[in-house]
Each structure stands twice: as structure tokens, then as C-alpha cells.
Amino acid sequence: RMTYADLCRYIEEEAGRLGIFVSFFQSNHEGAIIDEIHSAYGKKDGIIINAGAFTHYSYAILDALKAVALPTAEVHISDINAREAFRRNSVIRPACQVCIAGRGYEGYVDAIKELAQQIQNHG
């Protein structure tokens, strides 16, 4: 089982192989997540977000993602579409260009590749 630090190292190594720099942020506080999203404007090329339970009800995170208008990938380690009915609804999805669910930790690497391709194609 991977720790959060292990996951960050894994993602950083895989992104490095692609020549991509990544930074990380984790919080259980909705406002802190929103602040981090807002701080990405003009500084980051894209956002990969696993919003956890906020996925299902945080219209504030949706609004923040829409406001910064960066290429965004929604990632879930488990397949949220195969879980309880309430987990199948993502209120943040309209602000995301891609949703990757059920691929475990590899989903983060898939998201990096997807966003890199979109950024390359659309500038």
C-alpha cells in the first residue's frame, strides 16, 4: 500500500520521464483547495484534481475550476461509476476535460499524459 508521499514520488518520477514538472497540494479543507486552484491561475499549465467527497457536492470547487479555466483532469483511484449511486455524480466534471476513474494510482499518470497532449495541441 502506497503512502501519500510514495504516491507523490511515483507521480513525480513518471512525470519527469515525460519532461513534465508537477507540484502537489492536499487538503481536507474545501476553502484551502479553492485557494490553491485560484493560485494556479497564470502560474500552472493544468490541474489534476482528486476532490474526494467534494466531487459530489462542491459547487465552490467547480466555480473555482471554471474561473481559472485551465486544462483540468478529474482523477479517482476507484471507479466511482461502479460504487454507490451518490458517488456516481460529479459536480466538478463540467470544468474538467477528462475524467479518469478506476485506474488506481496509474490514473494520475494517465491524467498527466492526457493534459500534456491537450496543452500541446491547444497551446
Features from the language model and the residues they span:
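Short, glycine-/small-residue-rich phosphate/pyrophosphate-handling segment
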Residues: 21-24, 73, 82-123
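Structural motif
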Residues: 25-38
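Short Gly/Thr/Asp-enriched flexible loops that form oxyanion-binding sites at enzyme active sites
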Residues: 39, 58-67
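Short glycine-rich anion-binding loops that position phosphate/pyrophosphate groups of nucleotides
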Residues: 52-55, 78-80
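Helix C-cap/helix->beta junction micro-motif
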Residues: 18, 44, 68-71
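Glycine-rich phosphate/diphosphate-binding loop of Rossmann-like nucleotide-binding domains
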Residues: 1-18
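Short acidic/histidine-rich motifs immediately flanking catalytic phosphotransfer sites
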Residues: 40-47
